[in-house]
């Protein structure tokens, strides 16, 4: 709740309109209080309800995510070709070092455990959209390089990737 509230305050202070869509949760019987809070700001539009991202993805020009665990949402976003800002924290994401390095290459990366991250994010969001697109285009080299293996591979799925990883690990550890 506090992180979402901080994000909404930050979004309300940038020089652009913002759309806020939280990840659907069933924590509340009534309206999610963070949605009600966000509606108080003139430049923040709240998407109510549990709409799947693919049905509302055309509304944004840039996306901010705080979890790479929603794989389908991530792949939808990447395929849109619009800038993605990833808010990383070691408090809830369980990414190994290799995954963190890849995420830094794929996305505009903000470490929310770092003092002053809010200012860093605000500075990025206040850039002209053409600069944001350039930042994103610079990431495309890495996305293209790793897309099939790590992101949106059309012939892969988690079971095959997991089996491939385990097989390689066993082979590496049994060679003498």
Label for each model-derived stretch:
Residues 58-69:
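Acidic donor-binding loop of glycosyltransferase active sites
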Residues 1-36, 151:
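Conserved catalytic-core segment of nucleotide-activated headgroup transferases in glycan assembly
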Residues 35-36, 41, 67-154:
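Catalytic binding pocket for nucleotide-activated donors in carbohydrate/polymer assembly enzymes
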Residues 15, 59-61, 81:
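Short, well-ordered alpha-helix to beta-strand connector turns
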Residues 50-60:
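Short acidic alpha-helix that forms the nucleotide-activated donor recognition element
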Residues 151-176:
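C-terminal alpha-helical cap of glycosyltransferases
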Residues 31-50:
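Nucleotide-activated donor-binding/catalytic signature segment of Leloir-type glycosyltransferases, i.e.
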Residues 18, 46, 84-85:
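Hydrophobic beta-strand scaffold residues
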């Amino acid at each position: 709740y506090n992180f979402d509230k901080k994000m909404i305050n930050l979004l309300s202070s940038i020089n652009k309109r913002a759309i806020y869509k939280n990840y659907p949760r069933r924590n509340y019987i009534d309206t999610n209080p963070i949605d009600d809070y966000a509606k108080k700001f003139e430049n923040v539009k709240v998407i109510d309800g549990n709409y799947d991202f693919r049905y509302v993805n055309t509304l944004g020009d840039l996306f901010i995510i705080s979890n790479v665990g929603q794989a389908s949402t991530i792949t939808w976003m990447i395929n849109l070709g619009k800038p993605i800002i990833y808010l990383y924290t070691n408090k809830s994401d369980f990414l190994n070092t290799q995954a963190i390095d890849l995420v830094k290459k794929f996305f505009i990366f903000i470490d929310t455990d770092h003092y002053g991250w809010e200012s860093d994010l605000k500075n990025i969001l206040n850039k002209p959209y053409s600069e944001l697109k350039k930042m994103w285009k610079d990431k495309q080299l890495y996305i293209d390089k790793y897309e099939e293996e790590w992101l949106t591979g059309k012939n892969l799925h988690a079971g095959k990737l997991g089996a491939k990883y385990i097989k390689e690990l066993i082979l590496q550890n049994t060679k003498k």
